[in-house]
């Protein structure tokens, strides 16, 4: 599965993609006190609630217009 992250001024959107298409989308406000651990826990919680557990992420693509948030997101997306 591939993870695509868009860090915008309003929201952070995470999409999980396979050869069969988009599997799940997650959305949260950008301007929160994001830390790497908090991001990791949020993604795990959201995926579990949507029925996606123990997924294997093969690659990550990040797009960002908010550099301070990008640093924490990169730390949190270390697989």
Give residue ranges: language-model regions.
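Gly/Thr-rich phosphate-binding beta-strand-loop-beta motif of the actin/hexokinase/Hsp70
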Residues: 1-23
């Amino acid at each position: 599965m591939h993870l695509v992250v868009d860090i915008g001024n309003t929201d952070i959107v995470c999409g999980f993609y396979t050869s069969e298409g988009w599997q799940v989308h997650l959305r949260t406000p950008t301007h929160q006190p994001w830390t790497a651990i908090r991001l990791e826990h949020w993604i795990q919680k959201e995926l579990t609630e949507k029925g996606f557990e123990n997924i294997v992420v093969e690659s990550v693509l990040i797009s960002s217009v908010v550099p301070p948030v990008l640093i924490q997101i990169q730390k949190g997306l270390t697989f």
